[in-house]
């Protein structure tokens, strides 16, 4: 079997969105599965819309997802001599001709064709005029006016196109730049691409590209067109459905392995398995198991998956990932060891790093702010004696094991004739500022003796002020 070579050719006109990321992932996995090569190519011939910032955003997203490439990135704007050579081959072989039809005249003829019920395609006026290159002239492909072009798609099966329905598409614009359909074929030919895996919005381009391959006498690659991703309303996924760019998900606190796992399952399956390691994905991925119908992006399932990966990561591994989110909130700096001790208390409770950072607040601030309703309900005069007893008992302890803490609390509530909940919830408010948090003994253990005693004393002073 010949070496598998795939490619991912984004246009640098914006961020890398998840549809493009899934395409990159499928190409990457297919190449890695067969021990082949994965090429990154930047399609930047749209000089007006292509930007350096978009190129950087795409490369950053690929690196964040750990989709490494074996060659590239190649830039189409640096390959103009290659396209020029292949354009001349098309002219010399009679497969292309120059056209000087003015844009406004083309538009008038297009509207006339539509008014007469004809397909609004180029009418071939310059086909046999024998024009040479010149100002304001484009180069067009001489499309066969009969016959059928067949796209044998790995995913969709055979698709038939009548050549008479196709257009004499422009291969080279009047400014000398090659068009997408021509440049992509030349790139794939010269880079020996064996498999073209892309979104099914490219299906209608494919017969035109097949005809260009044939005109150049080049071998066709295998084609596989992946169904699109839809929002929950079954419309094509867009910004109105929420975040769609890869880096936006990073900024939401999503882990790259969670995004990889979710994207690959949007359209591909391997039995009933939901969770995959990267090694498992490489071993099991195949185009035969890509579905033919569109996939629906489910935000809740995605967050469930991210929560799974957050729980699977060790606290020590999460610290550097979490730290930028803590810094963004302006929390006081704490040692990595301290943050790592707090993380296990939050891992079962959060779905993103942003949520973890938000819930980490009470561990990091010097003084907690009380939720007004919680303070009104729980930080009351009746808590003076339990808090003072707790201060004395905790100050006398050498360490805060769960067994010791439970013994202290049980002893105090028993002696005061109270139920544990009547004391535990006010203590929770004193230590965290609110009524919802990880387990109380876990919190005390992480905060440590000094912070716990300080917060209990602060709560007593608050109670005194309220009573005064």
Swiss-Prot record:
One of its GO terms (molecular function) is tRNA binding. Its main location: cytoplasm. ATP binds at residue 239. A motif ('HIGH' region) lies at residues 10-20. Zn(2+) binds at residues 99, 101, 126, 128. Its EC number is 6.1.1.17. Its cofactor is Zn(2+). A motif ('KMSKS' region) lies at residues 236-240. GO terms for cellular component: cytosol. Keywords: Aminoacyl-tRNA synthetase, ATP-binding, Cytoplasm, Ligase, Metal-binding, Nucleotide-binding, Protein biosynthesis, Zinc. The keyword Zinc applies. Binds 1 zinc ion per subunit. GO terms for biological process: glutamyl-tRNA aminoacylation. It comes from the Bacteria. It is found in: Cytoplasm. It catalyses: tRNA(Glu) + L-glutamate + ATP = L-glutamyl-tRNA(Glu) + AMP + diphosphate. It holds the Pfam family Anticodon_2. Catalyzes the attachment of glutamate to tRNA(Glu) in a two-step reaction: glutamate is first activated by ATP to form Glu-AMP and then transferred to the acceptor end of tRNA(Glu). Monomer. Belongs to the class-I aminoacyl-tRNA synthetase family. Glutamate--tRNA ligase type 1 subfamily. HAMAP family: Glu_tRNA_synth_type1. This is Glutamate--tRNA ligase. It comes from Syntrophobacter fumaroxidans (strain DSM 10017 / MPOB).
């Amino acid at each position: 079997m010949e070496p598998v070579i795939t490619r991912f050719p984004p246009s640098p006109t914006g961020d890398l969105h998840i549809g493009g990321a899934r395409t990159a992932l499928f190409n990457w996995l297919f190449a890695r599965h067969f021990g082949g090569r994965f090429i990154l190519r930047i399609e930047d011939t749209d000089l007006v819309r292509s930007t350096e910032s978009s190129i950087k955003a795409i490369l950053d997203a690929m690196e964040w997802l750990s989709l490494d490439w074996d060659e590239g990135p190649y830039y189409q704007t640096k390959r103009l001599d290659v396209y020029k050579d292949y354009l001349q081959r098309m002219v010399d072989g009679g497969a292309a001709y120059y056209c000087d039809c003015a844009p406004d005249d083309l538009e008038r003829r297009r509207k006339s064709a539509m008014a007469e019920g004809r397909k609004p395609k180029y009418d071939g006026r310059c086909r046999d005029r024998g024009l040479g290159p010149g100002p304001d002239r484009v180069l067009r492909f001489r499309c066969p006016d009969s016959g059928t072009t067949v796209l044998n798609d790995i995913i969709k099966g055979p698709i038939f196109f009548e050549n008479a329905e196709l257009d004499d598409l422009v291969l080279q614009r009047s400014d000398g730049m090659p068009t997408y359909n021509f440049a992509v074929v030349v790139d794939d030919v010269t880079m020996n691409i064996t498999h073209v895996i892309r979104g099914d919005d490219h299906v209608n381009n494919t017969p035109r590209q097949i005809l260009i391959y044939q005109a150049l006498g080049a071998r066709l690659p295998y084609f596989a067109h992946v169904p699109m991703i839809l929002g929950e309303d079954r419309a094509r996924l867009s910004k109105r459905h929420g975040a769609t760019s890869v880096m936006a998900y990073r900024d939401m606190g999503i882990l790259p392995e969670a995004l990889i796992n979710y994207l690959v399952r949007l359209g591909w399956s391997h039995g009933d398995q939901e969770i995959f390691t990267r090694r498992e994905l490489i071993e099991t991925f195949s185009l035969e198991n890509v579905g033919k119908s569109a996939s629906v992006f489910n935000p809740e399932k995605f967050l469930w998956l991210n929560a799974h990966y957050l729980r699977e990561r060790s606290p020590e591994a999460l610290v550097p990932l979490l730290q930028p989110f803590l810094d963004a909130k302006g929390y006081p700096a704490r040692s990595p060891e301290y943050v790592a001790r707090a993380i296990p208390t939050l891992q079962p409770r959060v779905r993103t790093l942003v949520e973890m950072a938000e819930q980490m607040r009470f561990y990091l601030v010097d003084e907690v702010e009380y939720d007004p309703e919680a303070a009104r309900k729980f930080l009351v005069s009746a808590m003076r004696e339990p808090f003072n007893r707790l201060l004395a008992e905790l100050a006398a302890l050498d360490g805060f094991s769960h067994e010791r803490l439970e013994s202290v609390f049980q002893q105090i509530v028993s002696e005061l004739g109270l139920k544990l909940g009547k004391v535990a919830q006010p203590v929770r408010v004193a230590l965290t500022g609110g009524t919802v948090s990880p387990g109380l003994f876990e919190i005390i253990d992480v905060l440590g003796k000094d912070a716990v005693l300080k917060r209990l004393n602060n709560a007593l002073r608050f109670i005194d002020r309220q009573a005064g």
